[in-house]
Structures are given as structure tokens and as C-alpha cells.
């Protein structure tokens, strides 16, 4: 049975107006992710955001394919995703959540400042789809502590606690050009 009234407005509790209904979780495609994160191929490790509750949690997806450069050397006869890249995927998902809340984000960078309790529980191989869930533990000014987990087909493959900090983006340095040789 539907919870929609005849005039197609959602049912509300007596204390709740339609404007106070919780918003649907936000999603992001790859272009929106790229507008937030400075990472690019081959180091952009989230493909899509499927859920996001501002300042609380984010769920992102990463599709693993044999075409990724790490599989050329890790390991050619048994390709598995390096654990450190899974932790980086957790940090990037958390970074997307954090930077989505930062005003003037083009003038900011997000630095990964710590990793705690990282555990790698199962190998990840080409063909797997990572579901990366990150939840805010503590958000203080520019620093955020987040707990992250990655599952494949509902099975936990990695979890870690990460800390990130927003810092001003330094001005680009223009190196002095060497003088042209004198003839």
C-alpha cells in the first residue's frame, strides 16, 4: 500500500510538514566527483556516489577492471587490488563528503593525515564492485575523523579509520626558466 495521498504529497506526521521531510540521499556521477576531488586517472578511485547524507555519511562505488595499471605488477599471474588503494578509496569517498560542505573548495586541498586500524579481510580482483561506506566519527573545524568499510557482494573486504584535513591550496609555483644559451 502506498504512503502517498490522493494529491500526490507524502504523508507526514502531525508534527511534520512536507517541507520538513528528510531529503533523499544525494548521488553524484563521475563529473560531479571530479569537480570535488583533485585526483585523476589512474588515481581517482571512486566512480559514483550512490548515497550521501551531508556531514554524516557517504556510499560510493568503484568498479575494478583488469585495465587498471596496478594489475600489471600486482600481481601479473594473480591480480589483486593493493590494500593501500582500498584505504585511499575510503579517504577519497570521505573527501568527497567533506569537500561537498566546504565553501570556496577550489581554493582548498584535502590532506589525508592518519590511518588507524586498517584491516584487509579478503582479496579484491578484477570484476569486483567495491561498495565504499564512510561515516563521520568526529568533525572539528577543518579536520574530520571517519570510519570506512568496503564490501564486495555484501562481504567485508577492508575497513579503516582515516583522518583528513582541509588546507588552503598553495599558489602554483612558476619555476624560473633557464636562460637561452648565448651564441
Annotate each language-model stretch with its function.
Residues 79, 151, 155-157:
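Hydrophobic small-molecule pocket/channel-lining residues, especially in calycin-type beta-barrels
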Residues 40-81:
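Catalytic strand-loop segment that frames the active site of acyl-thioester-processing enzymes
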Residues 2-34, 158-183:
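Segments adjacent to and within acyl-thioester-processing domains across lipid
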Residues 65-99, 111-112:
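Compact, glycine-rich, soluble single-domain proteins
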Residues 49, 116-153:
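Hydrophobic beta-sheet segments that form the core/acyl-binding groove
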Residues 50, 56-65, 125-133, 158-161, ...:
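Terminal leader/tail segments of proteins
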Residues 54, 67, 139-141, 153-155, ...:
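Short coil/turn motifs at secondary-structure junctions
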Residues 3, 24-27, 94-131, 157-159, ...:
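Hydrophobic beta-strand-centered segment that forms part of the acyl-chain substrate-binding groove
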Amino acid at each position: 500500500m502506498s504512503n502517498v495521498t490522493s494529491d500526490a504529497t507524502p504523508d507526514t506526521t502531525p508534527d511534520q510538514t512536507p517541507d520538513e521531510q528528510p531529503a533523499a540521499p544525494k548521488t553524484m556521477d563521475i563529473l560531479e566527483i571530479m569537480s570535488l576531488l583533485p585526483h585523476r586517472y589512474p588515481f581517482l578511485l571512486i566512480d559514483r556516489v550512490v548515497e550521501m547524507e551531508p556531514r554524516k555519511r557517504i556510499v560510493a562505488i568503484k568498479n575494478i577492471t583488469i585495465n587498471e595499471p596496478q594489475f600489471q605488477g600486482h600481481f601479473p599471474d594473480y591480480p589483486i587490488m593493493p590494500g593501500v588503494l582500498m584505504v585511499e578509496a575510503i579517504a577519497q569517498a570521505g573527501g568527497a563528503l567533506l569537500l561537498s560542505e566546504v565553501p570556496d573548495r577550489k581554493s582548498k586541498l584535502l590532506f589525508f593525515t592518519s590511518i588507524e586500524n586498517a584491516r584487509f579481510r579478503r582479496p579484491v580482483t578484477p570484476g569486483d564492485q567495491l561498495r565504499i561506506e564512510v561515516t563521520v566519527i568526529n568533525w572539528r573545524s577543518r579536520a574530520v575523523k571517519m570510519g570506512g568499510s568496503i564490501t564486495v557482494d555484501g562481504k567485508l573486504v577492508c575497513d579503516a579509520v582515516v583522518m583528513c584535513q582541509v588546507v588552503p591550496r598553495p599558489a602554483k609555483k612558476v619555476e624560473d626558466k633557464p636562460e637561452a644559451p648565448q651564441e
